[in-house]
Amino acid sequence: METTRQLGEWLGKEKKTIIYGGANLGLMEDIASAAKANGATLIGVVPKILEKNGKVSTLPDKLIHTVNLSDRKDVIVEESDILVALPGGIGTLDEVFHVMAASTIGYHHKKVIFYNVNGFYDTLLKALQQMAQAQFIRGLEKNEYYLVANSFNELINILKKPNLTDNND
C-alpha cells in the first residue's frame, strides 16, 4: 500500500520512534520497513503467542516481551505519545477501543488518529456518532477521543501539532 510506505518514509526522515506490535506481517510491517530504512527507531511489543508462532519481525531495534495481548496493548499505550489507526481488522479495532475506553475513565488523555484511507473508517465513525447522539458516548462532540485524517497531508499536519498529547499521564 502506497500510503504505508509514504508514512513510514516520513516517520523515518523525522527520526521518530515507532512502538508497534512487532509482528512480521500486515501494514505495520510495511511502515516499519520504510521507516527503518529512513532512520526511525523501532520498538516491537510482542506477546508470547507471536514468538511461539514465529511471527516476530526482525526489524525492531528493541523488543518488549509481554504475556498476552492485553499486556501488549497496555505497553503500547503507556509508551506511545500518538496512536495512529491504519485500516485494519479485529486487532486494530481492539486496540482503538482499548485506547478510547481507557481515555474515557481517565487513564490517559491520548487520542486515536484514524487514518481514514479511501473512507475506510467512515462506517465506524458514523456508528460512533450515533452512539454519541444516543448519549452512550460522552465527549465525542469535543473530539476528546479521536481525530480523523482523510489524506496523507492531513495526517502529517495532525502529527506535527505541538500539543497533540498529554504527557502528564
Predicted regions and their residues:
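Glycine-rich beta-alpha loop segments
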Residues: 1-41
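Acidic/glycine-enriched connector segments
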Residues: 25-85
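A charged, well-structured terminal subsegment
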Residues: 78, 82, 133-169
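Active-site-adjacent beta-strand anchor residues
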Residues: 21, 86, 114, 148-149
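Glycine-rich, charge-decorated loop segments at or immediately adjacent to ligand/cofactor-binding or catalytic sites
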Residues: 26-33, 120-130
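Active-site/ligand-binding-proximal alpha/beta "capping" segment
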Residues: 71-106, 113, 164-169
